[in-house]
Design a protein with these regions (language model features):
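Conserved helicase/translocase P-loop NTPase motor core
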Residues: 183-199
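Hydrophobic residue at the +6 position relative to the catalytic HRD Asp in the kinase catalytic loop
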Residues: 209-213
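Long, hydrophobic, amphipathic alpha-helical segments used as structural scaffolds
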Residues: 87, 200, 346-350
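Conserved catalytic-loop position in the HRD/HxD motif
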Residues: 200, 205-207
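Residue-level signature of catalytic and energy-coupling elements of molecular machines
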Residues: 72, 109, 207, 227, ...
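Helix-rich C-lobe and terminal helical cap/extension of kinase-like folds
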Residues: 57-59, 104, 113-115, 120-187, ...
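Conserved ATP-binding subdomain of kinase catalytic cores across diverse folds
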Residues: 1-166
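Short, charged/polar micro-motifs that form catalytic or ligand-binding hotspots
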Residues: 22-26, 62, 66, 199, ...
Length: 437
């Protein structure tokens, strides 16, 4: 159920999309969710012989916290504070204010936002008709409603639901925010990279329905992030390891890659790197890939069962020692996959892998948790790292030219096709919608 105030200045009231039978305690709901998830995961673990069941307590805890709006309010305020303290993001990202005095575990009251959903590409990119030095309704001093006009009044029935605030689209309603998809997507990747590598507080449900885009009076885009129920916290040691992992993957530093994943109990660095990058990793020993290369289609069909067994083994190798495996990686992977899908949906306007890797390397220089001597060493490595990333730019611009000439898709389409092909060779069909909210 979702209810909204219909007057500017009064916030929206939301109790989310959870079905809560009248009189049923919230603890019962959490118990039911946990029991159902345990049962399904146990069946999967037994049928496919993959150690999923040990992950149930952590996943169930995260999902149950989504039903607690006080937890969501805490996450929302913490994220707003972190963004306000980061000069590279504070003018590009906005977190709606929460009214604590009007909120509880079952209901959260938050600031009303007028914006365009991420999936409405036309509304984001069409020309702006809202006036000079004006922004989206309610954005940084822009009035929520235009000055009163003497024309025909609004439909009174519609006004009871919510006032129309489409004056910025122009008389024929064909205008838009006049923004660049590249600027929008850059802000998104910057935001979630900072969450992973700088702050260790990661929003794990960044699908298009949870992201609004507004136009500031300056003409620049502003990303509004909502729905802060599903977060994970990364301790400083794990956060530094994860940043080093990304640097190692992008520079083919297989020694560092192997060292890090070994401490996590992972037995197959290549497959793990591919799953993290969302593209086949070409820098390791390629043992898994070589086992599949050189086979004809008929040979692959004959070996279908063996390849499925190899796929199961690869997953077991990724999970490795369940006592060492960082369970946060489940939801970090979800975030990465959804952000990749968002970039793909918008036509791959940015080199997501390069931006993410740059934040990882930069975090090892800027993190307050690291000693000064290590920061200085990482600074020199960061300069070298930026040079190495030039090859990633070459591939990105190759795909952009190909896309412009209508000879193929964008960078994310190529990555998606490579991953689909790699998985198919292993007897697995990837469901591209599995992480998209």
């Amino acid at each position: 159920m979702r209810l909204f105030s219909n007057w500017p200045g009064i916030c929206g009231l939301s109790s989310k999309y959870y079905y809560l039978p009248r009189g049923q305690p919230q603890t019962n709901l959490r118990t039911e969710l946990t029991s159902l998830h345990r049962a399904v995961t146990w069946v999967y673990s037994k049928i496919f012989d993959i150690p999923f069941y040990s992950l149930v307590p952590y996943i169930s805890e995260r999902l149950s916290l989504e039903t607690d709006f006080l937890n969501e309010a805490d996450n929302s305020e913490n994220m707003a504070r972190l963004i306000a303290g980061e000069p590279r993001l504070r003018d590009r990202v906005y977190i709606p204010k929460v009214w604590r005095e009007l909120s509880s575990k079952r209901v959260m009251t938050a600031e009303w936002i007028e914006g365009v959903r991420l999936w409405d590409k036309d509304a984001i990119t069409r020309s702006w008709r809202g006036g000079w030095r004006q922004g989206s309704p309610g954005c940084h001093g822009t009035p929520m409603d235009p000055p009163a006009k003497t024309g025909a009044p609004m439909n009174p029935q519609l006004a009871k639901v919510k006032p129309e605030r489409n004056h910025w689209r122009g008389q024929n309603n064909r205008g838009g925010l006049g923004l660049s998809l590249k600027d929008v997507m850059t802000t998104m990747v910057d935001l979630f990279s900072a969450q992973m590598f700088l702050w260790g507080l990661v929003h794990c449900d960044p699908h298009p329905g949870n992201i609004f885009i507004r136009r500031k009076p300056s003409g620049r885009p502003e990303l509004v992030l909502i729905d802060h129920g599903l977060y994970i916290h990364m301790d400083p040691n794990f956060r530094h390891q994860y940043a080093r992992l990304w640097k190692a993957m992008l520079t083919f530093d297989n020694d560092t890659l192997g060292e890090i994943v070994k401490t996590w109990g992972v037995n197959n660095p290549d497959i793990f790197a591919s799953a993290t990058l969302m593209r086949p990793y070409r820098g390791g020993d390629l043992s898994t890939q070589r086992g599949l290369e050189g086979l004809s289609k008929s040979e692959k069909a004959q070996r279908h069962y063996e390849m499925q067994q190899a796929a199961r083994k690869a997953i077991r190798d990724i999970l490795g020692d369940e006592t060492k495996w960082p369970q946060e990686l489940i939801f970090i992977g979800r975030n990465l996959r959804i952000v990749q899908a968002n970039n793909q949906f918008l036509g791959s306007p940015v080199n997501r892998v390069k931006i993410t890797g740059t934040w990882a390397s930069r975090a090892l220089v800027e993190s307050a948790d690291l000693p000064l001597s290590e920061k200085i060493r990482n600074l020199g490595r960061h300069v070298v790292f930026r040079i190495v990333l030039f090859t990633s730019d070459l591939f990105f611009w190759f795909t952009k030219i190909r896309q412009f000439l209508h000879l193929g898709g964008g960078m994310e389409d190529s990555i998606e096709a490579q991953m689909q092909g790699m998985a198919k060779d292993m007897g697995v069909e990837l469901n591209q919608n599995i992480f998209e909210g």
